[in-house]
Amino acid sequence: MAQQVNEWLIALAVAFIRPLSLSLLLPLLKSGSLGAALLRNGVLMSLTFPILPIIYQQKIMMHIGKDYSWLGLVTGEVIIGFSIGFCAAVPFWAVDMAGFLLDTLRGATMGTIFNSTIEAETSLFGLLFSQFLCVIFFISGGMEFILNILYESYQYLPPGRTLLFDQQFLKYIQAEWRTLYQLCISFSLPAIICMVLADLALGLLNRSAQQLNVFFFSMPLKSILVLLTLLISFPYALHHYLVESDKFYIYLKDWFPSV
């Protein structure tokens, strides 16, 4: 009886590694978003229950403690969890970058606040975009999609196997980073153009009426223009990411056969 309990505990520990690694990068599963680390650990523990019998049947615990092979097992699980979390966190990082860029252009970078979603200092628009994306993520079934990827990863990459750092892996990471910056620019570009035009108009106004302090109402004017532009462009804001996400499958198909 004691041996079976130990085997189940070892299987639970192995099953817990991959979701824990995923939560370290995915903003929605961080302790700041869920309220406390204890609550986050409870959520992650519940995510491991569906795959716990599968890991127990693989008898991985027979190899634990006999040599140092468990180090490779833990490293492989961490790499897989980080890879899934990195892909899922790209949109959240991109909208936070877009918000910080817009606040920099409108001169409101001193109003930074703590964003519990990404657990870092962010701007006002960055927090707004992050909360908006969280709502869209849950409404559109993004969390279900992430869980499907997590559980299907155990079918293609069971514990003991890991991803290879080959040329296809580098191409995939390069595509992810390129999409991160493209999504940031495409998300904030309409508002950037409006603010540049507003700065040009205020500059011409200052040349014609030098007694008028245009900097006094430049920030409120640009803030209103940014909000109006974003309200108009929100339906098309994440379209670029949906288009680019189809290209990810091409890199995944080239990468996974080498595993």
From Swiss-Prot:
Transmembrane segments: 9-29, 35-55, 78-98, 127-147, 185-205, 214-234
Entry annotated with the keyword Protease: no
Alphabetized InterPro entries for the sequence: T3SS_IM_R (IPR002010), T3SS_SpaR/YscT (IPR006304)
Primary location: membrane
Any Gene Ontology CC annotation: plasma membrane
Compartment(s) of residence: Cell membrane
Cell membrane among keywords: yes
Function per UniProt: Part of a type III secretion system.
Protein name as it appears in the record: Secretion system apparatus protein SsaT
Organism of provenance: Salmonella typhimurium (strain LT2 / SGSC1412 / ATCC 700720)
